[in-house]
Every structure is written in C-alpha cells, then in structure tokens.
Curated annotation (Swiss-Prot):
<keyword id="KW-0157">Chromophore</keyword>
<keyword id="KW-0812">Transmembrane</keyword>
<dbReference type="GO" id="GO:0007602">
    <property type="term" value="P:phototransduction"/>
</dbReference>
<keyword id="KW-0807">Transducer</keyword>
<keyword id="KW-0675">Receptor</keyword>
<keyword id="KW-0681">Retinal protein</keyword>
<keyword id="KW-0455">Luminescence</keyword>
<dbReference type="GO" id="GO:0004930">
    <property type="term" value="F:G protein-coupled receptor activity"/>
</dbReference>
<dbReference type="GO" id="GO:0007601">
    <property type="term" value="P:visual perception"/>
</dbReference>
<keyword id="KW-0599">Photoprotein</keyword>
<comment type="similarity">
    <text>Belongs to the G-protein coupled receptor 1 family. Opsin subfamily.</text>
</comment>
<keyword id="KW-0716">Sensory transduction</keyword>
<dbReference type="GO" id="GO:0009881">
    <property type="term" value="F:photoreceptor activity"/>
</dbReference>
<dbReference type="GO" id="GO:0016020">
    <property type="term" value="C:membrane"/>
</dbReference>
<dbReference type="GO" id="GO:0008218">
    <property type="term" value="P:bioluminescence"/>
</dbReference>
<comment type="function">
    <text>Visual pigments are the light-absorbing molecules that mediate vision. They consist of an apoprotein, opsin, covalently linked to cis-retinal.</text>
</comment>
<keyword id="KW-0844">Vision</keyword>
C-alpha cells in the first residue's frame, strides 16, 4: 500500500 501527500498512489 503506497500513498503520497497529494493523495495519488497505489493501493494493493
């Protein structure tokens, strides 16, 4: 699970 400060990322 990876999310960045701008809220765009990947959820696994």
């Amino acid at each position: 699970m990876d999310f960045n400060i701008s809220g765009i990322g990947n959820v696994s």
